[in-house]
Structures are given as structure tokens and as C-alpha cells.
């Protein structure tokens, strides 16, 4: 059993993009920014507990940070983890519905 405190730290924010919107409409998949050390099991448990929906599968990937310049200095943005969470048939979760 995963502690509730950990579940709250796993999910960071919804990732809103054209690709994420298309995935939601086409395959009932939500895209989230998650903690870099989060596992698929933790992500699944957190989504089910916090949003009260049934999760079918979780796919994850690590987005590499871009190299950026500020004048002569070269820096690098942090890497972050993205999760594609596919909900079971009939389940619905709408992040941007309140913005319309």
C-alpha cells in the first residue's frame, strides 16, 4: 500500500498540448507531468485515488531538458517525466472543461 502523502507528490500537473488534447479525444488518454522517480504503479494508484476513475494502462517517458543560452552562459533545463494514462472505457476526466 502506497502512503497518501507519496500519492500527492507523484502527480505534478496536467500536460496541455495539441497532442495531449488529441489523445484525450481519440483514445481516452490523459497526459500528466509526474515526479521523476515515480513508478507506473504509483502513478496508477495516485490517479485512481485522487480522481476516482479506473485506469487501464500507464505509459511513461522521460523528456530530456533543452540546452539554453543566456548571453555567453550555457545552461540546461531539468529533465522531467511524462505519463500517458489510459482510462477504462466509460471513464471520463476533463481538465480543461472549466476553462471554456
From Swiss-Prot:
Keywords: Ribonucleoprotein, Ribosomal protein, RNA-binding, rRNA-binding
Pfam family of the protein (one): Ribosomal_L23
Tree of life domain: Bacteria
Biological-process GO terms, alphabetical: translation
Coiled-coil region(s): none
GO molecular function terms listed in the Swiss-Prot or TrEMBL record: rRNA binding; structural constituent of ribosome
GO cellular component: ribonucleoprotein complex; ribosome
Entry keyword Ribonucleoprotein: yes
Entry-linked InterPro entries: Nucleotide-bd_a/b_plait_sf, Ribosomal_uL23-like, Ribosomal_uL23/eL15/eS24_sf, Ribosomal_uL23_CS
UniProt keyword annotation of GTP-binding present: no
Role this protein plays: One of the early assembly proteins it binds 23S rRNA. One of the proteins that surrounds the polypeptide exit tunnel on the outside of the ribosome. Forms the main docking site for trigger factor binding to the ribosome.
Subunit: Part of the 50S ribosomal subunit. Contacts protein L29, and trigger factor when it is bound to the ribosome.
The family this protein is said to belong to: Belongs to the universal ribosomal protein uL23 family.
Protein name: Large ribosomal subunit protein uL23
Amino acid at each position: 500500500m502506497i502512503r497518501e502523502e507519496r500519492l500527492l507528490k507523484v502527480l505534478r500537473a496536467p500536460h496541455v498540448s495539441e497532442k495531449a488534447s488529441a489523445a484525450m479525444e481519440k483514445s481516452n488518454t490523459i497526459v500528466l507531468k509526474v515526479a521523476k522517480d515515480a513508478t507506473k504503479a504509483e502513478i496508477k494508484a495516485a490517479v485512481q485515488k485522487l480522481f476516482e476513475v479506473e485506469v487501464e494502462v500507464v505509459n511513461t517517458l522521460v523528456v530530456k531538458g533543452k540546452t539554453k543560452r543566456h548571453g555567453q552562459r550555457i545552461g540546461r533545463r531539468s529533465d522531467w517525466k511524462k505519463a500517458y494514462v489510459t482510462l477504462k472505457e466509460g471513464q471520463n476526466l476533463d481538465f480543461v472543461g472549466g476553462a471554456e
